[in-house]
């Protein structure tokens, strides 16, 4: 009887082993995975096997997405110990370790068991690839407790379900490390890692140097990542207990693929897979602009990307070295204008809003303390420099105290946080008086909206609108240079009586531009209305408009490549402000070379908001039956169907980029080899790997990095794609221009054939074409 039972158990064990061996997602103990073999997760989402990245001949054991056409590796076992032939074999040993052997049967890589696992509990260990992309070692029959898992030892990829952070009990710290290059998965220069000192936060480092800091979690998001918002793709979660602190996310729809990757160039970016394009689409970046550079403005300095210069001292502080500050070196930061009165108990706090909170490594926190008690605790400690709520939800709760200097602060237009900065009581009284005077002036300005100048004043300033003062002719009338009685030089936009800009457009331009403040937008100073006369008074830009340089055979040489690329970046920042960062969401609708002015330092200033349209906070598109704009710059969907969106401006920006690079107009472009316009010509050259041939010869000597110019051309082509959905948002454009993020291949541009512009498709549209090919046009669509 006993022998029968033993035989029965042996049969069951043998049968179970056979079933496991037949499973495509499992390896059993001592079973071998050879180069050329793979195991695939049960749902077919991920595959494990050997691969060679890019043009490399080295072999690695890795995990990649199974269902997509582009091999995307999410984890590499032997990243620093490559195989040099096809001899690699993988086994799971009886003690629960994964072992990778080379041709000499030497172990070149092995897994380490989880700190919490007990080898005594091992029984029939197996290795399995899950549909989450997690490669696990577990006991046969136990799918809950893992002996080891790849998600505990990530490489450059943050996958759904991974606990990205630190376990205080086991000491396990899960962090990202970049590849050395796109075809070399060995340990790269960049890491993104949780620092538990003070209030935990993530630090992106290049080797040992901090590049970017996320800031602490405030209950809704990291304070240094305002773009992290609830979305339909994934649901994120932050867990902070006595045992562990980590950030994780889960897919809202398992069929949607998304990943966060630390690229070899240090860019920490999220991508989503677009099936119809068969490519990864950029979705979000941790770093947005130069203000994200760690401690750019030094101690007690704050960075605002919409200001020029970007750095300024917090209220109550002054530059430590004024000369360096003026020269653009802000690294030494700021110091207190008035020393603290801590010993006398007369200090107070100034509330500063919409901030990225300072570095919290030297901070202290209490999750439950109320804000009033938080303030008292800070006042009792002379080294306490600021305080803030730990969690901003439900009106705020908890307490963070900072000790020592406040560093790495920046300002946002939205989703920033309140910080209470310690100042001497006398300093607070001074600031309150200044604030009261400023508020009074602002109220007066809001009541008046803009200063009104009478006709006589404007006429005298422009010498009676003399021909000698005329700067140029726009679509809505002439522009004159003027000098006010106070000596200030101005530009006067005088609307012609036959101008197509009616009262509506005039009011629109006043209301819009009066509310806009950005270093890359022209500043309006006042207006004049007298019977049929309507005029706008702007700050004067001595270098006039961009088109007077790039399209002029002689003056184009004054704009070398460094200046041109800065102009492109300036225009991009200005458009991003209009689309996302201003109090209003604005579509310009007439972005072109003649509407970009240049100041004395050749900084770009976007002008002419007569055609601009505002959208609601969540709107991104609208329709019109009155199409207005300029041929050569208007997007196809707008010119043909009257459909305009933020992507319409992106199209115009792309045209402008290609014009700046080439020194040629899109409209009227001629080439002996074809009948394409500039967009079509640039696209054709790009496809033939000859994009460099469109570069303006005037910048050849100053163009020391051809790859930068080719990248700008590439970005321009992405902006002018036919389908608006394919075009990037301006936030992505700014990021592409300021980083080395990977770029998708551009698709066919819109209106790339000059000869077939639109006449065959729009017979119902009555075109009203102005005599000047480069003036603003108006199309009345009767539909």
Curated annotation (Swiss-Prot):
- Residues that the record marks as modified (Phosphoserine) are 499, 594, 607, 771
- Positions bearing carbohydrate: 30, 95, 189, 381
Give residues annotated as binding ATP.
471-479, 493
Going by the entry's taxonomy, the superkingdom of the source organism is recorded as Eukaryota
A biological process (GO) annotation for this entry? Answer: recognition of pollen
Disulfide-bonded cysteines:
291-303, 297-311, 374-399, 378-384
Domain (Bulb-type lectin): give its ranges: 24-150
Every copy of the Protein kinase domain together lies at: 465-742
For molecular function, the Gene Ontology terms on record are: ATP binding; calmodulin binding; carbohydrate binding; protein serine kinase activity; protein serine/threonine kinase activity; ubiquitin protein ligase binding
Alphabetically sorted, this entry's keywords are: ATP-binding, Disulfide bond, EGF-like domain, Glycoprotein, Kinase, Lectin, Nucleotide-binding, Phosphoprotein, Receptor, Serine/threonine-protein kinase, Signal, Transferase
Q: CDD domains this protein is in?
A: B_lectin, PAN_AP_plant, STKc_IRAK
Keyword ATP-binding found: yes
Q: Where is this region: CaM-binding?
A: 554-571
> What InterPro entries does UniProt report for this protein, alphabetically?
Bulb-type_lectin_dom, Bulb-type_lectin_dom_sf, EGF-like_dom, Kinase-like_dom_sf, Pan_app, Prot_kinase_dom, S_locus_glycoprot_dom, Ser-Thr/Tyr_kinase_cat_dom
Q: What is this protein called?
A: G-type lectin S-receptor-like serine/threonine-protein kinase At4g27290
Q: Which organism is it from?
A: Arabidopsis thaliana
